[in-house]
C-alpha cells in the first residue's frame, strides 16, 4: 500500500500532523489495553505544552519560548526535510547550491531574532564538493554558521569514506567547525 505524503506545515513537518487513519490501516492487531503506551497522533498533541509554537507558526519567538520552557540556553538548528530535497543523485549542482543558499540565508535571518541563543548548522550542496566547500566558507564566515549537517547516504556515487570528500573535511578543519551526520527527521 502507498502511504499518503507527509503534511508539511510551513516547512515544519511533524509525525503528529499525519492522519491517524493512515496508521490505523497499518495496525494489523489492536494491542491489548494496558500493554502499550498510547500517544496521540492527532487532536491533542504529544507535546501539548508546546502548542503555542503551532499557533505562532513556528516563528523564532516560539523557538525561544520553547527553549525557555525546556531550560535550554542555546540551540543549534539543523535542516529537516530540506536534506531530502538536495539528496537526489544527478541533481544539477547549481540547483542544489541555489536551494542551500536560500535555506541557509533564511535560517540565518531566523537566528537573528536572538543570535546569542539561536545558532545554525549549514545545509551544503553535495553534488559538487567544491560548491560544498564554498558554501561552508560563506555560511561560517558571513552568516556565522557553527558547522554543517549532511545525510550519511552516498550521493552521485561517492560514499563518505571516499577521498572525493577530503576537501570538504579539510575545510571543516580549517574553519574549526564540526560536521554532523544524520539520516533525517524520522531516523
Spell out what each predicted region is:
Residues 1-187:
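Helix-coil boundary/capping segments in enzymes
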Amino acid at each position: 500500500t502507498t502511504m499518503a505524503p507527509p503534511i508539511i506545515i510551513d516547512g515544519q513537518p511533524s509525525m503528529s500532523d499525519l492522519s491517524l487513519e493512515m496508521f490505523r490501516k497499518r495496525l494489523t492487531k489492536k494491542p491489548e489495553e494496558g500493554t502499550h503506551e498510547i500517544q496521540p497522533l492527532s487532536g491533542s498533541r504529544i507535546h501539548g505544552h508546546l502548542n503555542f509554537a503551532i499557533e505562532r507558526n513556528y516563528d523564532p519567538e516560539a523557538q525561544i519560548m520553547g527553549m525557555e520552557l525546556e531550560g535550554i540556553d542555546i540551540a543549534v538548528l539543523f535542516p529537516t526535510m530540506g536534506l531530502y530535497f538536495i539528496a537526489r543523485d544527478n541533481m544539477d549542482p547549481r540547483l542544489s547550491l541555489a536551494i542551500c543558499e536560500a535555506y541557509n540565508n533564511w535560517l540565518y535571518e531566523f537566528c537573528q531574532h536572538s543570535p546569542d541563543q539561536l545558532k545554525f548548522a549549514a545545509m551544503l550542496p553535495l553534488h559538487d564538493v567544491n560548491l560544498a566547500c564554498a558554501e561552508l566558507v560563506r555560511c561560517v564566515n558571513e552568516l556565522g554558521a557553527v558547522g554543517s549537517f549532511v545525510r550519511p547516504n552516498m550521493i552521485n556515487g561517492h560514499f563518505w569514506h571516499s577521498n572525493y570528500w577530503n576537501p570538504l573535511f579539510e575545510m571543516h578543519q580549517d574553519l574549526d567547525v564540526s560536521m554532523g551526520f544524520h539520516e533525517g527527521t524520522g531516523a
